[in-house]
């Protein structure tokens, strides 16, 4: 892990060198996910973070954090009309996130959007199952235990899935599992309080930031899991079992400095 931490310490201080992150996330039912992901990316060192959200939640997301840039697409759900906006964002970004809180998205539109993205990406939550029909050779997938079923059903194991698709997978749990190129790594940092809502979004933001700063996908997944766990340990030491995701996010700089 020291090798990966040294990679972080070598990041240039020049503006934009620390990466621009695009986020396609959120819905009327889950308007807070874009801000959680974005704040985690910013605290991990990204220079600029831009969220692309459905029109009905634009005002909510835009008012949550003045550090977050926010664009919108028409309609209440992610549909065909949002694919072109996603492609445009990917041309601006150094890394992209798709999926957190993306309720009722059109699966075909999600798959098509992923296929238009040329930069490294993190595929999460409600974009995971539609992504299985897309090109994932530039992706890190971050399923929870409940979301990994379709992958195992289709491929038998995470190792087989990673070998066949080229994807990297981070499966969080009591012991996190990172699978890349058919190999499995483990991360044991973290506490039992890390099951609180929003820590998955925090992980996504951290990993996306590392990708945007130039790390390869395997390194970003491995270090991202470690950073989340260590940051959670610091936050839990302060707040006890009442720790929430924003407590964790605010301790990210203490972990990576």
From Swiss-Prot:
Domain YjeF C-terminal: 1-257
InterPro entries linked: CARKD, Ribokinase-like
Signal peptide per UniProt: none
Alphabetical UniProt keywords: ATP-binding, Lyase, NAD, NADP, Nucleotide-binding
Cross-referenced CDD domains: YXKO-related
Catalysed transformations (reactions): (6S)-NADHX + ADP = AMP + phosphate + NADH + H(+); (6S)-NADPHX + ADP = AMP + phosphate + NADPH + H(+)
GO molecular function annotation: ADP-dependent NAD(P)H-hydrate dehydratase activity; ATP binding
Binding site for (6S)-NADPHX: 201
Top-rank EC class of the record's enzyme: lyase
Enzyme Commission code(s) on record: 4.2.1.136
GO biological process: metabolite repair; nicotinamide nucleotide metabolic process
Binding site for AMP: 200
Cofactor(s) demanded: Mg(2+)
Family: Belongs to the NnrD/CARKD family.
Record text on subunit structure and interactions: Homotetramer.
Described function: Catalyzes the dehydration of the S-form of NAD(P)HX at the expense of ADP, which is converted to AMP. Together with NAD(P)HX epimerase, which catalyzes the epimerization of the S- and R-forms, the enzyme allows the repair of both epimers of NAD(P)HX, a damaged form of NAD(P)H that is a result of enzymatic or heat-dependent hydration.
Protein name as it appears in the record: ADP-dependent (S)-NAD(P)H-hydrate dehydratase
Name of the gene this protein is made from: nnrD
């Amino acid at each position: 892990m020291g090798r990966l931490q040294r990679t972080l310490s070598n990041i240039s201080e020049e503006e934009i060198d620390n990466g621009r992150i695009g986020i396609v996330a959120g819905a009327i039912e889950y308007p807070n996910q874009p801000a959680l992901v974005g704040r985690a990316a910013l605290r991990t060192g990204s220079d600029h973070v831009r969220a692309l959200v459905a029109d009905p939640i634009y005002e909510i997301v835009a008012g949550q954090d003045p550090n977050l840039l926010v664009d919108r697409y028409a309609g209440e759900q992610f549909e065909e009309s949002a694919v072109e906006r996603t492609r445009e964002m990917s041309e601006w970004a150094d890394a992209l996130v798709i999926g957190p809180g993306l309720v009722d998205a059109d699966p075909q539109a999600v798959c098509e959007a992923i296929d238009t993205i040329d930069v490294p990406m993190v595929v999460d939550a409600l974009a995971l199952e539609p992504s299985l029909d897309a090109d994932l050779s530039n992706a890190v997938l971050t399923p929870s235990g409940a979301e990994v079923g379709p992958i195992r059903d289709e491929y038998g194991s995470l190792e087989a899935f990673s070998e066949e698709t080229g994807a990297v997978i981070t499966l969080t749990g009591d012991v996190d599992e990172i699978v890349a190129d058919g190999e499995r790594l483990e991360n044991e940092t973290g506490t039992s309080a890390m099951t609180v809502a929003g820590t998955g979004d925090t992980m996504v933001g951290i990993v996306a930031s590392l990708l945007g700063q130039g790390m390869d996908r395997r390194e970003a997944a491995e270090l991202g899991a470690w950073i989340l766990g260590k940051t959670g340990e610091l936050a839990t030491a302060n707040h006890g079992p009442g720790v929430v995701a924003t407590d964790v996010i605010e301790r990210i700089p203490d972990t990576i400095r």
